[in-house]
Amino acid sequence: MKVGDRHYHTIWLNEDGRSVDIIDQRWLPHEFRVVTLKTIADIAVAIRDMWVRGAPLIGVTAAYGVAIAMAEDPSDTHLDSVWEELHETRPTAINLRWALNAMREHLRALPEQERAEAAYQRAAEIAEEDIELNRAIGANGLKVIREIAARKKPGEPVKILTHCNAGWLATVDYGTATAPIYMAVEEGLPVHVYVDETRPRNQGAYLTAWEMNGHGVPHTLIVDNAGGHLMQHGDVDLVIVGTDRTTANGDVCNKIGTYLKALAARDNGIPFYVALPSPTIDWTVHDGVKEIPIEERAGEEVSFVQGRAPDGSIASVRISPEGSPAANPAFDVTPARLITGLITERGVADASPEGLKALFPERS
């Protein structure tokens, strides 16, 4: 997508052919920074400390991490070691495991002397596949927006609420939940997006609002607890969110607070959709609440908030009393029964084993 007058992906191969460049998302929306990752340690830090984030982008970054590692040491031992090191960085996002497995399975079949080149090629393929998957998700989600727009008065916007950032910054390009929105705007459909701030890391306020602003999408930033109120008063027509892991029965694990939005949507009769590429589906898990490991992040993310100070510097300030401990679960699970549909690259599925298998019969 565009930043200013230039088109960017969130990650790309450096001109040296070995390192990778990323948009360092820790500084958005106040500063736009590109950094170069040269080692497997750089990759691990970038994923763990959320220089990059979003399940699809985490997977692609890990794939390039394997490539960097193979250029250093293409042995089986190193391949397995890198798999373990990267897998531990963000345990909830299933795309991470999917990408690491795809890389390891592809490389194990090759002689060591061929692995480095093959690894970079496969990582680039995974990145390109992500773009195509998101483009298809956008086209399928656009149909949902069109259906709602058709019931509106001419010029009346479709009012969409989204949570966290499932935008192009969470993928290589387009995004998942935002792809249908961008396509609707390109088609000329009037939309208005309500952007949850999404505490504690404020990815809605920092990232989604930045995306919407950059692409001229009408939007309003709201506090996390305002969504239910807006739904009660008819200000939301549709909720679209992303997911970090979706189970075989249609449960969705997404940023903390998603479950509450789904409950409010159900109580007010508002359709609640989840946009996801198929690598986000964990076909081995059938009960999201019981089986998905929920990442617990540092309490400091709750106790401190980052922003631009009056002198123009980026500062972190404490917002809670010293000595007050903070819990920080990063995700929650929305049961399939609360989900209207799963927007995938193959179409919109019911959030059920039958619905998913109808679109992915090879998993039957």
UniProtKB/Swiss-Prot annotation:
Residues that bind substrate:
53-55, 90, 203, 254-255
Q: What are its E.C. numbers?
A: 5.3.1.23
* The reaction(s) this protein catalyses: 5-(methylsulfanyl)-alpha-D-ribose 1-phosphate = 5-(methylsulfanyl)-D-ribulose 1-phosphate
| GO MF annotations in UniProt | S-methyl-5-thioribose-1-phosphate isomerase activity
Q: Which Pfam families match?
A: IF-2B
Q: Which Cys pairs does UniProt list as disulfide-bonded?
A: none
BP-aspect Gene Ontology terms: L-methionine salvage from methylthioadenosine
Please name the catalytic residues of this protein: 244
Question: What pathway is this protein a component of?
Answer: Amino-acid biosynthesis; L-methionine biosynthesis via salvage pathway; L-methionine from S-methyl-5-thio-alpha-D-ribose 1-phosphate: step 1/6
Which keywords belong to this entry? Answer: Amino-acid biosynthesis, Isomerase, Methionine biosynthesis, Plasmid
Show which residues form the site (Transition state stabilizer): 164
Q: Enumerate the InterPro entries for this protein.
A: IF-2B-related (IPR000649), IF-M1Pi (IPR005251), IF_2B-like_C (IPR042529), Initiation_fac_2B_a/b/d (IPR011559), M1Pi_N (IPR027363), NagB/RpiA_transferase-like (IPR037171)
Q: Which PANTHER family match?
A: METHYLTHIORIBOSE-1-PHOSPHATE ISOMERASE (PTHR43475:SF1)
State the similarity comment.
Belongs to the eIF-2B alpha/beta/delta subunits family. MtnA subfamily.
Outline what the protein does. Answer: Catalyzes the interconversion of methylthioribose-1-phosphate (MTR-1-P) into methylthioribulose-1-phosphate (MTRu-1-P).
What protein is this chain from?
Methylthioribose-1-phosphate isomerase
